[in-house]
Curated annotation (Swiss-Prot):
Name of the gene: OPG051
Lineage of producing organism: Viruses, Varidnaviria, Bamfordvirae, Nucleocytoviricota, Pokkesviricetes
Keywords: Early protein, Repeat
Protein name: Protein OPG051
Family: Belongs to the orthopoxvirus OPG051 family.
Induction description: Expressed in the early phase of the viral replicative cycle.
Positions of Sequence repeats: 16-17, 18-19, 20-21, 22-23, 24-25, 26-27, 28-29, 30-31
Residues covered by region (Disordered): 19-38
Amino acid sequence: MTLVMGFCCGRFCDAKNKNKNKNKNKNKNKNKKEDVEEGREGCYNYKNLNDLDESEARVEFGPLYMINEEKSDINTLDIKRRYRHTIESVYF
């Protein structure tokens, strides 16, 4: 199991869409289903707690998710759509 933390909704921020809508904020929080399904490179606000350095002593916790690595691809994580059935939420 891997512990990751971040926002409760994965925000897909494809570089192409980010540059296209740079000055327009109307589509900034929309996840594009086509982008996620095609496996395009995206970025999410998640940190793997197993990879944190010891120097990062202060961590601000949001919801934590336990993800079964055998069933999920951590690089294309889309919590709302793809991994609803494999996630257990832990709140502090």
